[in-house]
Amino acid sequence: MSTLSLNDTCPGNLHGTSAELFLTLLNTLLTAKCSLGNPKNYPVDFGPNIRNGDEFDFIVIGGGSAGSVLANKLSENQDWRVLVLEAGGLPSATSDIPGLMYNLQETEEDWAYKTEPQNTSCLSMKNKQCKWPRGKVLGGSSVLNAMLYVKGNKANYDHWAELGNTGWDWDSIKEYFTELEQVLPPASETTPLGTDGLLPLTKHYSNEPIKMSLQEAYEQVGIKYLEEQNPEKPIGTVDVPLCIDRGQRANTGKKILGNYQNRTNLLISLHSFVQKITIEEKVAKGVEVEIGGNLLKLKAKKEVVLSAGAINSPQLLMLSGIGPKENLQSLGIDVVEDLPVGQFMQDHMISWHEIKLSLDAIRYPKGPADPLYEYFIRQEGPLSSLSLTNFLTFLNTKNDSMWPDFGFHYFLFPPNDQLLGPGVRKGVGFVDSIATTMSNECKSNPCLMMIPTLLTPKSMGQIMLKSKNPRDYPLIYSGSFTDKDDEDITVMVEAIRFNERLIQTPALQKYNPEVIRFPIPECDKLEYGSDAYWACFMRNVASTLYHPTSTCRMGVQKNESVVDPRLRVHDVKNLRVVDASIMPRVTSGNTHAPSMMIGFKASVMIKEDWLS
């Protein structure tokens, strides 16, 4: 039997300085790899210690963007035992690498939901279904998302307050964003953002030639660059902060729970599948949860708080008897409270406008080896930040300076991209003919994905139970482009028209931009470039920006909302919902930061209610 030997596989040996350098390189690579997905960065799983009948002060269902913040702040009171029940496990090493964001979809960290087929959207996706990834992992969707820290704008929150939700106007909630923010040096020296908060934020400015040209192109059409995102004056282009800490994703499970794992009253139970909330005489008493193959009944002395997200929170409410009466009765579920759970769902729709560019638009290498090396050695380069994805645009078709209704995100793919591009095409779920076209057109040239984004949708969808089996996924009807006056489609077509203007600017023309035409048989019957063509295009290739909200929305009237302005479920005691599902209307931007703000504000209200 031969013995493994390094000498056997190489023609010569390294000695002296060269050997030392080689060993240093290997050690650096191993150290970098071991820092990714390190379980020591997370709380120890308390699940094996839980027994049937155990009692806690607060039971928080879901350890995502909102739930992590809520549990952290509640556990500041050492007299309160706070249990977080998380359906998933710890985030993987892959999740720590920002540039591999799309590679996490349809893994064990993703619930991997899909919408039900509808005739208004997702028509050129496989099976006419859009993929709706949601985080099934400690940290929730902060483990899967694009790491963009976007607050929304003042008008969003003032509108919430105008609907009767006292205390949710911009002036009342902006302090909670500041409390969350920990902007890292050197940006912390000049930024108006907070510097001592829970979540590390990095200011990133892409040095790709095309990024600077995009900024110049916007200025050539009269759109200003904003040095910082300004919720009170949001129109313009801006580089938003990223939830990244020294090249690694800063998910809430790691930074907001893991960094406080020394608190003995903050308990995290992983792989804990909640089946229902136990309610007696309209008072929440606890939960039924499966942990380690055992079904346990746990008690909450004070409150049960649902922070399971805009899909799972309404599902659990309905399984527990809170929801639309007719739907629950048809499934044999006893009705506790007739409320519009799962209704009024909103989401940001995006489309895909791919532009082929000349080679001088990009600077980083053609192959995957150099970015990987750069990341593992220095945790820098394209994998550390998603390139120019944090360069955002907020615009308005109606010249309303306070409330943008569309904007743009951007992806930049190098020639024959083997890192981000394949993940995007697979993750979105295009039919093969479109995915192949996208790939083939970008083999020899870099491609810029200009992504029109619908920021103030009028359309609404809904979540419905498929059965009363908790393991059955709910039915997701996105409702995209179903508003009666087709305002959403009109705004998205206007966004394409804006793109066309932008491409014609001198700043972009120097790259010989060429719009890649996707093969869509239904749309190819129409005049290419007409409004009718682009409307057809939207119904076929538009997809989600992964921002479902409003399925347990906040309000005063029971027939139009699920929770009151203090996030208490109407007419059910000791039960709250604290996540993006409570938004009366979706904010005009990415929803991760607002979800964390909701968790923070909820903790303040809960403390007021129990300590006053």
Feature roles, as predicted:
Residues 1-612:
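N-terminal redox-cofactor-binding region of secreted/periplasmic oxidoreductases
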